[in-house]
Amino acid sequence: MIIITGHGNFASGLKSSLDLIVGNYDFIKVVDFTENKNPEELKNDIKSIIDKYSDNELYIFTDLAGGTPFKVSSELALNNNVKVFCGTNLPMLIEASMMVSLGCDIDTNFIKETGINAINPKKKVVEFKEEGI
């Protein structure tokens, strides 16, 4: 089971992109931390998913280390079978969702490396020339 959470519509935005690339999986849940939600509501929303799927390995992917979604998720992970990632990007979620879809546990080190490798700057830069008006 994968839970994606973050500030604003970070989670639902990533899920939308993920669905286009790998398909819509039932084992991926999203919890957005929007401006009309307080930290306790966020915690309750995430906890309800954890409680419902407590028999499964659970992985929570968050946006920022130290942010409210990360802190709430980390707190909930202490008493549950949950692993928490921060700094989530789309390549991490693609790999994680493929692992779960194949019935594998998520290789946390591989997911971390995938996230890091996805942000490497490219050596070749494409230059655009402005056409005259």
Q: What annotation goes with each model-predicted range?
A:
Residues 1-61, 65-133:
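N-terminal loops that bind phosphate or other acidic moieties
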